């Protein structure tokens, strides 16, 4: 979903709620909170905690360090 130069495919999708939502770009994601269609992630880190769902990518195989590194990367976009 988050591909290309702005890290979005600009597609409207159903994230399991029955509603349609535009895939937002990841560029600037560190400055746009809360995150997700329902605002469940107050921070990027929350995406990997209480808001983690398979509909937003599988993170089960990521280590704690992988997640920390990914959060640091996302904050640079």
Protein language model regions, located:
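Periplasmic c-type cytochrome electron-transfer domains
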Residues: 1-77
